[in-house]
């Protein structure tokens, strides 16, 4: 049997576990965080044009899909390299008008690309779920700089404040890496303090592991023991479990979607 070569369109294939679909709108990454191999493996960012995305979303909605999740390594940097430079807020506005589509989500965002325009789009568009995934990765500025994240703790705190002012009922998820090379107990405590202060709905935590080809592996010494990383990971999981329980307790007796 002949095997058909992949087309430019099929490279952006969508999985369709109806009634939901996960839909890649941008591939690659331009950020080059020191611990991440993605930019080297997947190349620079490449966005799909809005008309193409709308057409395919309309097609899957006709087949019964009610909810789409827009995907990208840094989904909120969508469109900057396209000729007319649309952004994610423009795309959300376009998809919000599709008849039969009930919900729109997107992930994962980068703090430096989370614009006020995008925040206001989430607040105002009725089909866009009030949920934002926004990885902080660490609560110490020196660690963030070593990670090459491109923002400070103070910037991130103000960003979360702006989001919560604009979207009072927003659910925010974040990611944290523990045991990054050189992370001291004091620096880890700053991450705990930040999580306690910002009280995220969900925290995804991972222990740092060297990735061949990344600048962190080339330039930094992985000096935190595996048991030490495991203890820090468990500490965050226990903290977040308490926070999530307290948040959920406030919802008792309410009807929520």
Where do the language-model regions lie?
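A broad, low-specificity signal for short, low-complexity segments enriched in glycine/proline
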Residues: 94-95, 219-221
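Structural detector for short beta-strands of small beta-barrel domains
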Residues: 252-257
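Short acidic, glycine/proline-rich loop/turn micro-motifs
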Residues: 144-147, 215-219
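Proteins enriched for Cys/Gly/acidic motifs involved in redox and nucleic-acid/cofactor modification
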Residues: 1-78, 117, 122, 132, ...
């Amino acid at each position: 049997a002949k095997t058909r070569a992949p087309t430019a369109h099929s490279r952006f294939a969508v999985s369709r576990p109806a009634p939901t679909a996960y839909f890649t709108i941008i591939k690659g990454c331009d950020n080059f965080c020191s611990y991440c191999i993605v930019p080297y493996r997947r190349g620079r960012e490449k966005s799909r044009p809005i008309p193409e995305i709308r057409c395919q979303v309309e097609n899957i909605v006709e087949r019964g899909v009610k909810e789409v999740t827009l995907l990208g390594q840094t989904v909120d940097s969508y469109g900057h390299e396209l000729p007319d430079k649309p952004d994610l807020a423009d795309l959300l506005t376009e998809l919000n008008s599709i008849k039969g589509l009930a919900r729109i989500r997107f992930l994962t965002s980068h703090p430096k690309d989370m614009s006020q325009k995008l925040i206001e789009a989430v607040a105002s568009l009725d089909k866009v779920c009030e949920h934002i995934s926004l990885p902080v990765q660490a609560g110490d500025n020196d660690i963030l700089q070593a990670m090459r994240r491109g923002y400070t703790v103070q910037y991130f705190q103000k960003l979360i404040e702006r989001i919560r002012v604009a979207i009072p009922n927003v659910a925010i998820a974040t990611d944290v890496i523990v045991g990054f090379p050189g992370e001291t107990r004091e620096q880890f405590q700053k991450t705990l303090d930040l999580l306690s202060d910002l009280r995220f709905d969900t925290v995804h935590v991972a222990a740092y592991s060297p990735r061949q080809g990344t600048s962190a592996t080339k330039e930094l010494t992985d000096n935190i023991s595996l048991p030490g990383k495991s203890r820090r990971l468990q500490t965050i999981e226990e903290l977040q479990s308490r926070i999530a329980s307290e948040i959920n307790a406030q919802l008792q007796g309410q009807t929520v979607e």
